Amino acid sequence: MDAQGDAGAQGGSQGGPRPSNKRLQQTQAQVDEVVGIMKVNVEKVLERDQKLSQLDDRADALQEGASQFEKSAATLKRKYWWKNIKMMIIMCAIVVILIIIIVLWAGGK
């Protein structure tokens, strides 16, 4: 009985590691799969970070360009406003001179 008991105990322990070993292999395969997925995810996150960085650089450049455009537009607006004022002053001066000439010419007759 002792020999059978020992053999039964060994047989039970031999049968035990095999399913446990299979479970370990399945678990390891799942872990490997998860590691692979996580590596892909990390690569995607790094690519996304790089793209976001490039987008941020573009946005900064665009903001700088918009600011420069705004300054140029304001300067141009002032320039043409003064040109318009000068033209109106010249036209008013011409009208005043014409009125003076007409008054003097009419007064001389």
UniProtKB/Swiss-Prot annotation:
It is found in: Cytoplasmic vesicle, Secretory vesicle, Synaptic vesicle membrane; Cell membrane; Synapse, Synaptosome. Residues 1-26 are annotated as: Disordered. Residues 23-83 form the v-SNARE coiled-coil homology domain. The chain crosses the membrane at residues 87-107. Disruption phenotype: Worms exhibit arrested development after embryogenesis. Viable mutants appear lethargic with sporadic jerky movements and absent M3 pharynx motorneuron activity. All mutants are resistant to the acetylcholinesterase inhibitor aldicarb indicating impaired cholinergic transmission. GO terms for molecular function: SNAP receptor activity; syntaxin binding. Residues 1-86 are cytoplasmic. It comes from the Eukaryota. Expressed in the nervous system notably the nerve ring, ventral cord and dorsal cord. One of its GO terms (biological process) is defecation. Residues 108-109 are extracellular. InterPro entries: Synaptobrevin-like (IPR001388), Synaptobrevin/VAMP (IPR016444), V_SNARE_CC (IPR042855). GO terms for cellular component: axon; cortical granule; neuron projection; plasma membrane; presynaptic active zone; SNARE complex; synaptic vesicle; synaptic vesicle membrane. Changing A66G: In js44; resist to aldicarb. It is a single-pass type IV membrane protein. Belongs to the synaptobrevin family. Involved in the targeting and/or fusion of transport vesicles to their target membrane. Acts in neuronal exocytosis of synaptic transmission. Likely to have a role in cholinergic transmisson. Required for viability, coordinated movement and M3 pharynx motor neuron function. Part of the SNARE core complex containing ric-4/SNAP25, snb-1/VAMP2 and unc-64/STX1A. This complex binds to cpx-1/CPLX1. This is Synaptobrevin-1. It comes from Caenorhabditis elegans. The gene is snb-1.
